[in-house]
Amino acid sequence: MNGERHVAGRGRRRRPDGVRDVVEPRIAVAVVTMGNRPAEVDALLESVAKQDLAPARIVIVGNGCRLPEFAQRLSLPGEVTTVDVEENLGCPGGRNVALARLREYGDIDVVVELDDDGLLVDADVLRRVRDLYAADPRLGIVAFRIADEKGETQQRHVPRVGNSDPMRGGYVTGFLGGAHALNMEMLAGTGGWPAEFFFAHEETDLAWRAADADWKILYAPELLLRHPRTSPARHAIYYRVTARNRVWLVRRRLPLVLIPVHLGVWSLLTLLRTRSADGLRAWLGGFVEGLREPAGERRPMRWRTVWRLTRLGRPPVI
């Protein structure tokens, strides 16, 4: 590397094969935080500042908190925007705030969303993201690989069924909420995050909408976010909200005939895997809540999307 640093601006460059010019997408980075991880947020933003392709914009959302000054203190590149939200809107709601601000600016093509306690280890992540989107105009979502401090990737962080190799990239049916890139043109058609979910399964809702609109979802393990090893059950609301949102998800997105199949398979797996009696009680309460409460707009996927997801290795009943 020659030490040069570029800003992610929309321009044209010649492809290596010399066939045609490629439009370079403008990249933004969005981070949502509740203000309880100041050191981790600083470290994450410093890792963004070290990228060899600087983002055109950085948006930081304080989800129910007031944010400190970041831009000058951390020498952040690009245009830096902070947004304080009075109440905690949950992760999807907070990310919608960032997306709304980026839409107002109207000059961003791809947004990279990162968990506030993650860290970009490599300096070429944003450049690689830019190149992936420049090469494929129908690329909707890029899923990063998430690994802990030891470099290990938990199986739940691999967007495939079964014990899949975390280093095997390719097209998939879902993505990880902790680190990913989203095509702004795609979001204009599919809509943003399901804010009412607050936490859990919001990625699947967005992924299914993207797939149904014929956008591609790519798992790119070379794009690494280091993240502390955690369990989703660490959240007090985990069992209830996971169950409620799963029911909402299938009510919103699946053809009617597949809804009982999906819920039956998922319920059986939950009963086999869950060892906590309190957790099962909370899960059952969430399941009932998901059936009783409005699930939001019903927009079931087409049967050809069901087949496409099945061919990619994850039929939407698992």
Residue ranges: model-predicted function:
Residues 148, 164-182, 204, 234:
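A recurrent flexible, glycine/aromatic-enriched loop bordering the glycosyltransferase active site
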Residues 107-119:
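Short beta-strand-to-loop acidic/aromatic patch adjacent to the donor-nucleotide binding site
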Residues 123-154:
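Conserved donor NDP-sugar-binding/catalytic core segment of glycosyltransferases
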Residues 85-105:
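Glycine-rich, basic loop-to-helix element that forms the pyrophosphate-binding segment
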Residues 213-237, 248-249:
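Active-site donor/metal-binding and catalytic loop motifs
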Residues 241, 256-318:
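Non-catalytic, C-terminal membrane-associated alpha-helical segments of glycosyltransferases
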Residues 46-55:
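Short, acidic, metal-binding catalytic loop of nucleotide-sugar glycosyltransferases
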Residues 174-182, 186-191, 196-224:
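A short, conserved alpha-helix in the catalytic core of glycosyltransferases
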